[in-house]
Amino acid sequence: MLSSVRLAALRAGKTNSVFQAVRAFAAEPAAAATTDAGFVSQVIGPVVDVRFDGELPSILSALEVQGHNVRLVLEVAQHMGDNTVRCVAMDSTDGLVRGQKVVNTGSPIKVPVGRGTLGRIMNVIGEPVDEQGPIECSEVWSIHREAPEFTEQSTEQEILVTGIKVVDLLAPYQRGGKIGLFGGAGVGKTVLIMELINNVAKAHGGFSVFAGVGERTREGNDLYREMIESGVIKLGDKRGESKCTLVYGQMNEPPGARARVALTGLTVAEYFRDVEGQDVLLFVDNIFRFTQANSEVSALLGRIPSAVGYQPTLATDLGGLQERITTTTKGSITSVQAVYVPADDLTDPAPATTFAHLDATTVLSRSIAELGIYPAVDPLDSTSRMLNPNIIGAEHYNIARGVQKVLQDYKNLQDIIAILGMDELSEEDKLTVARARKIQRFLSQPFQVAEVFTGTPGKYVDLKDTISAFTGILQGKYDDLPEMAFYMVGGIHEVVEKADKLAKDVAARKDESKKAKSSEALKDVPSLEKMAGEIKDEVIDADDSLEEDFKAEAISSENMVLNEKGEKVPLPKK
């Protein structure tokens, strides 16, 4: 137990400075206490119990610990009885001790909103973390807000063109809808999100908000640098021309920050939608980490785990976030959410619960990534409720279904091909396989954000060009072109150009091969003079041999032989 002197000192704010660090550009000090101050009674990792002598703060109220150079915000999660509230910390609790003074701000966590946030990076409590000075905003909003009323929501349906062929053709995104990117580790979710930010910002204008929830700090830094290079974010005097706000609560943050940073990003987006009437893009990478962070603190809050160890309030937590992402009569929020799939299991409770809220799903497949086809979008598993002839038109719908049919037929034939080989297929099936392989490769596309890694310039493909190209493939206009011509290109005109280039390269290689073979053959053939000399020598040798044979026969006919001196002598008598 603490001594009464020590406890009094702690309550007075005289705390040990061990573990305390000065955070540059910290937000303003805590608001004056609206009720009696409390003090820390228990610390269990990210969960802190605070005891109040007077009126208790309400659920979701923000409390601030006094005596820390680092601003430490606690959010009330439970009333425990005995004048004690249980809170979740938004930052590390290292150095926090029992008896430390805590004040109630009288409101939930509030963050700055408005154009002053554009081009800036903030954390879960609205503090800037980009070392660019304080965020200048005239308004602050609570991160806990009600979803728009049903009467305020819009029912209009319109496609958001992304410039990515496989998405626009087979699983188009709805403007003001919720889209999920499903995939395991390392199949390209973050790269696809970065490309979407790049394409939509350049093609459509408008503002974007990126919420980094529990992902790699390196990726967050890379995204920030690439946005600066591409002009989406501008620094200095031109910061007001920036098109994106970044809100980060990365892997190294405590679970409290990761559980609330998505709400902070959503609040910034809601301001642009409701006050400025903007069509806003909200990117969340990764929504699974939101669920995971709530799961981490759930047991410490005394909740009984449900399936696979997730919190029992999984559906409620996720629903509260997703219902705020919608289109109203004032503006829209289109949300693209990366969803990590644990062990590639789509039946896991976290991704399965997320499915219910989405208008479109883009499933990234490891088997397609292993073929070297990027983006590794599965054209058969990805879905969209926008793929409706009444919304996108009959032509787009028929071409999309035709492409999926060819790919499905190819998938059904793969077992036969693996066992019996291509030769056993009918001519019709062979044609289906050939077209399916071309479609599969044509669905690949070089990304602008990946240009520094691949060396291939990125491509933005208009929806009309995409539909026209796949129409030609299904009709057999490009059956004579090689498969490789369809790989990692933009429009169909690039396929034709690449096929011509490949044909010229093959012809050039054949000519070089013929020349090399003829030169090698000439090297092997001896010169005519050498051959004539060799023939002459052989003739002379043959003549000498014949002459000796004739002499021997003549001598033998005279019953004479040659002795050692070469003189004729009579044959010896028997």
Curated annotation (Swiss-Prot):
Its main location: mitochondrion. The keyword ATP-binding applies. GO terms for molecular function: ATP binding; ATP hydrolysis activity; proton-transporting ATP synthase activity, rotational mechanism. InterPro entries: AAA+_ATPase, ATP-synt_VA_C, ATP_synth_F1_bsu, ATPase_a/bsu_AS, ATPase_alpha/beta_chains, ATPase_F1/V1/A1_a/bsu_N, ATPase_F1/V1/A1_a/bsu_N_sf, ATPase_F1/V1/A1_a/bsu_nucl-bd. SUPFAM superfamilies: C-terminal domain of alpha and beta subunits of F1 ATP synthase, N-terminal domain of alpha and beta subunits of F1 ATP synthase, P-loop containing nucleoside triphosphate hydrolases. GO terms for cellular component: mitochondrial inner membrane; proton-transporting ATP synthase complex. It catalyses: ATP + H2O + 4 H(+)(in) = ADP + phosphate + 5 H(+)(out). F-type ATPases have 2 components, CF(1) - the catalytic core - and CF(0) - the membrane proton channel. CF(1) has five subunits: alpha(3), beta(3), gamma(1), delta(1), epsilon(1). CF(0) has three main subunits: a, b and c. Mitochondrial membrane ATP synthase (F(1)F(0) ATP synthase or Complex V) produces ATP from ADP in the presence of a proton gradient across the membrane which is generated by electron transport complexes of the respiratory chain. F-type ATPases consist of two structural domains, F(1) - containing the extramembraneous catalytic core, and F(0) - containing the membrane proton channel, linked together by a central stalk and a peripheral stalk. During catalysis, ATP synthesis in the catalytic domain of F(1) is coupled via a rotary mechanism of the central stalk subunits to proton translocation. NCBIfam families: atpD. PANTHER family: ATP SYNTHASE, ATP SYNTHASE SUBUNIT BETA, MITOCHONDRIAL. This is ATP synthase subunit beta, mitochondrial. The lineage of its organism: Eukaryota, Viridiplantae, Chlorophyta, core chlorophytes, Chlorophyceae. The gene is ATP2.
